[in-house]
Swiss-Prot record:
The gene is guaA. It catalyses: XMP + L-glutamine + ATP + H2O = GMP + L-glutamate + AMP + diphosphate + 2 H(+). It holds the Pfam family GATase. Catalyzes the synthesis of GMP from XMP. Pathway: Purine metabolism; GMP biosynthesis; GMP from XMP (L-Gln route): step 1/1. GO terms for cellular component: cytosol. It is an enzyme of class 6 (ligase). It comes from Haemophilus influenzae (strain 86-028NP). ATP binds at S233, G234, G235, V236, D237, S238, S239. This is GMP synthase [glutamine-hydrolyzing]. Keywords: ATP-binding, Glutamine amidotransferase, GMP biosynthesis, Ligase, Nucleotide-binding, Purine biosynthesis.
């Protein structure tokens, strides 16, 4: 079997907003990598045995006395090192160079003139002339290196940053003041490929097929002939976990699908058809709508609703697990960003917006071993694996759906009547987005039920019914988002269909708030 972890890159995180993007680019190249906080020990690095090390950017300044530094062992480990932005600055300082606060802060596009050949820039240029090859890059820095460490040479320069890139070819140390991991740097992926493949010598074994083979083998080794239980929601993560486990242990996997009454139109039936009928999984559907809605009755606070939905899910799941007396393992769809954020919340090294339900979400009394086949994977990698396992593209590429479901898209108190109206309105919106080709152009689109009534006119009569808000956004990372400029005729068609086809809705509005200041979800 292919050893997909044989060659690996260690990325030390100094707090940059782009650090996870570095890891995703390295994985995209086909090489395994892990992202660790900057203050790791020499022993931890030795045990990980990286083939190369990347130092990330940071919002900190190297000119500040207590700003973070790379462990000294990084530069004594006899492996190539690439410093990006702050990573280049701390490399320079720690090896005897000098950094200063720049008179001209650089944020945005820049053109770096390349000089003195370096393996890092081999066969790279964007707008070269015979005398001066250049790279179009993305800068984001306020400090700069003003004196090189011994044995380094300048390999890139801009008018305001004379040392925009540097290298020590003998020790294979490289620094770039720009960000190769962002798409704005046109040749960024090629530059990282030069470092990871050509300089570090990593083989590109991190592929969907190899990851599946490795995951199946590890599951078999971990659980043997034991039985495993999985809460299958129909979302991408739990679906991929289910298929990996099914491939590894077959009928020893017990999937529990909790139908909480807060799902999209016909979603419960679709989950059963997909995983029960098509893939032949051992799956139990639990109709818990009345239990969830009963607990939510009279509750309007969003955070309280989230906690109730989470608690009831655990209770229902626990009731089902007790019926399976031979189960020894619990499978979860934890993915790598969950692990990173959970670790950060414990160490205080990063600001975490929300805790994830997949990390440590079940009570201590459920004394089962944990199986987490996706723990090393980013979301885009999970999708690729899902496609390779046979999940339909329409399902894999579906827009995100919140864990509490319609519980946080019905504003205020959640009632069955409201959920039923919202389900039908949302189905019309998504159907028209797909028919018009706009579903793929938006990152997330959904409907929200507003608990206010509005006067409308139907025929010769007046009606006093509920309001639906439509929401569609475009985003790269969901940290910021722009409202999608959907065509007026499309919005008009959706509005007319909802008001005419969903009895109980009298008005449809479109949310044109960006993030920030608004969040993507209303609750």
């Amino acid at each position: 079997m292919t050893n997909i972890h044989n060659h690996k890159i260690l990325i030390l995180d100094f707090g940059s907003q782009y650090t996870q993007l570095i890891a995703r680019r390295v994985r995209e190249i086909g090489v395994y990598c892990e992202l660790w906080a900057w203050d790791v020990t020499e022993q931890q690095i030795r045990e990980f045995a990286p083939t190369g090390i990347i130092l990330s950017g940071s919002p900190e300044s190297t000119t500040e006395e207590n700003s973070p530094r790379a462990p000294e062992y990084v530069f004594n480990a006899s492996v190539p090192v690439l410093g990006i932005c702050y990573g280049m600055q701390t490399m320079a300082m720690q090896l005897g160079g000098l950094t200063e606060t720049s008179d001209h802060r650089e944020f945005g596009y820049a053109s770096v003139s390349l000089e003195n050949s370096t393996a890092l820039f081999a066969n790279l240029n964007d707008n070269s002339t015979a005398s001066e090859p250049k790279l179009d890059v993305w800068m984001s820095h306020g400090d700069k290196v003003t004196r090189l460490p011994e044995n380094f040479k300048v390999t890139g320069t801009t008018p305001t940053c004379p040392i925009a890139a540097m290298s020590d070819e003998n020790r294979r140390f490289y620094g770039v003041q720009f960000h190769p991991e962002v798409t704005h740097t046109k040749k960024g992926l090629e530059l990282l490929t030069n470092f990871v493949v050509n300089i570090c010598g990593c083989e590109t074994k991190w592929t969907a097929e190899n990851i599946i083979e490795d995951a199946v083998a590890r599951i078999k080794e971990q659980v043997g002939d034991d039985e495993v239980i999985l809460g299958l929601s129909g979302g991408v993560d739990s679906s991929v976990v289910a298929l990996l486990l099914h491939r590894a242990i077959g009928k020893n996997l017990h999937c529990v699908f909790v139908d909480n009454g807060l799902l999209r139109l016909h979603e419960g039936d679709q989950v059963m058809e997909m995983f029960g009928d098509k893939f032949g999984l051992n799956i139990t559907r639990v109709d818990a709508e009345s239990r969830f809605l009963g607990e939510l009755a009279g509750v309007s606070d969003p955070e309280a609703k989230r906690k109730i939905i989470g608690k009831v899910f655990v209770d229902v799941f626990d009731d089902e697990s007790k019926k399976l007396t031979n189960v020894k393992w619990l499978a979860q769809g934890t993915i790598y960003p969950d692990v990173i954020e959970s670790a950060a919340s414990k160490t205080g090294k990063a600001h975490v917006i929300k805790s994830h339900h997949n990390v440590g979400g079940l009570p201590d009394y459920m004394k089962l071993g944990l199986v987490e086949p996706l723990r090393e994977l980013f979301k885009d990698e999970v999708r690729k694996i899902g496609l390779a396992l046979g999940l339909p593209a329409e399902m894999i590429n579906r827009h995100p759906f919140p864990g509490p479901g319609l519980g946080v898209r019905v504003l205020g108190e959640v009632k069955k009547e409201y959920c039923d109206l919202l389900r039908r309105a949302d189905a019309i919106f998504i159907e028209e987005l797909r028919n018009s080709g706009w579903y793929e152009k938006t990152s997330q689109a959904f409907s929200v039920f507003l608990p206010v009534k509005s006067v409308g006119v139907m025929g010769d009569g007046r009606k006093y019914d509920w309001v639906i808000s439509l929401r569609a956004v475009e985003t790269i990372d969901f940290m910021t988002a722009h409202w999608a400029h959907l065509p007026y005729d499309l919005l008009g068609k959706v509005s007319n269909r909802i008001i005419n086809e969903v009895n109980g809705i009298s008005r449809v509005v479109y949310d044109i708030s960006g993030k920030p200041p608004a969040t993507i979800e209303w609750e």
